[in-house]
């Protein structure tokens, strides 16, 4: 097939997107496809025409545009199938505050939060005790994620976040280990337990620098905990109206309680990314994962794959 690989964009996660795109590009060619890279580095001008000249679009955008549903909406307009979730589910999952409302309504445990549409002022404090995490309401890859332990740190973090623009969300820091679990098709994959080796939490450097975090897959957890993680990941995927694949991030407390943090609709696809590790744990190679995502994308759009 003629595949348009859409990567790059103008968000702060541009470099991560392009890094992952290199591996995806190679995998698509190994699978026999003709691949063209489209990088909407400043605008989406030309995307509609480029997509219509191809049989399929493979998205590897992070943040905005891409995870917010805009590119998906344009592809729907072009009538070109693509992998992953549609416009509505993508927008909902990227908006962390809105997604947490969905979690609560569907009985999925998530830390309490305060949504900040604008800077609340230098003297503002949250209605819960420190420490807390404050982050962009519409970003990913742990960019602009701050752990704050006092009013002074909070004030500095707020200034930095709102200098970048956009919205923020703050929630109490739940102590425990980080666990992530992907969904592929209609099944949850084996979860991964994450132990950052430098930072106290899974920040941007830990996520994308080899050797900065210990990632254990399958996670060495009791069977009932593993089952609950997979159940919650699948429930969150369905509650948000997602399709194809996703990855849910959790905190597991020392008492064994789970807190759902967020759901990613376009999980990372770099050499250190989590979803490919989970797929490998059930015997799916990286190329096999890319091929499966294409199959799921075609099926979601009522298409069948022809020979490459």
Swiss-Prot record:
Position of the signal peptide: none
Cofactor(s), names only, from the UniProt record: Mg(2+); Mn(2+)
Cofactor note: Binds 2 magnesium or manganese ions per subunit.
Any Gene Ontology CC annotation: cytoplasm
Keyword Ubl conjugation: no
Annotated ranges, domain ATP-grasp: 100-295
Protein name: D-alanine--D-alanine ligase
Species the sequence originates in: Oleidesulfovibrio alaskensis (strain ATCC BAA-1058 / DSM 17464 / G20)
